[in-house]
Swiss-Prot record:
The gene is pyrH. It is an enzyme of class 2 (transferase). Pathway: Pyrimidine metabolism; CTP biosynthesis via de novo pathway; UDP from UMP (UMPK route): step 1/1. PANTHER family: URIDYLATE KINASE, URIDYLATE KINASE PUMPKIN, CHLOROPLASTIC. UMP binds at G54, D74, V135, G136, A137, P138, Y139, F140, T141, T142. It comes from Erythrobacter litoralis (strain HTCC2594). This is Uridylate kinase.
Amino acid sequence: MALPEMKRVLLKLSGEVLMGEQDYGIDPAFVMELAKEVKAAREQGLQICLVIGGGNIFRGMAGAAQGMERAQADYMGMLATVMNALAMQSALEQLGVHTRVQSAIQMDQVCEPVIRRRAERHLEKDRVVIFAAGVGAPYFTTDSGAALRAAEMNCDALLKGTSVDGVYDSDPKTNPDAKRYDTVGYGKVLADNLKVMDASAVALCRDNDIPIIVFSIREKGNLARVLAGEGVQTVVQN
């Protein structure tokens, strides 16, 4: 599959993948495996930004559904993404990959604030930049945060690593006949409500012509294969 030439990418990981085979929290061994994938991608000469969800620790919408105030629950979810970012930073630096965490909620003792020009300098110095705390405001998902940072950092593509190997016309977990798309347009994703990212994230990528590449991060070596245009994936583009 022909992919756009990529020099800088943003990798979005769902928080759930950090659980490994656990039901909750962070599996340090699996985080290390993910860090090895990121290191291998960086060694291909790519500049890499990362955004990690927080669903393995706390999901704001789930808290709101159980009676919490939505804004308060969303802030808790943002803090969960900072914990995940620090876990990934620790794993990457154990592998010798220099990493910086920037949070949209300022917490100077543990990470930097989001400053675009500073992030640019980090990338130019071959560091991985992990953006945490979403967009820093409630009612926005980490998918929207990933799309925003991809646009802000002029990324050539947004790679979404999940537990499924692409975009399907229905849920492959419940429908064995679900069809996987090799490529699909932003418009169809929005019109058919395909489960790629939330609508605002897809629209932001569409408006800034940022391809979204959906693939399974659980398969060892899959990130490198996807970046080489190999393996199973779905590309969302115009």
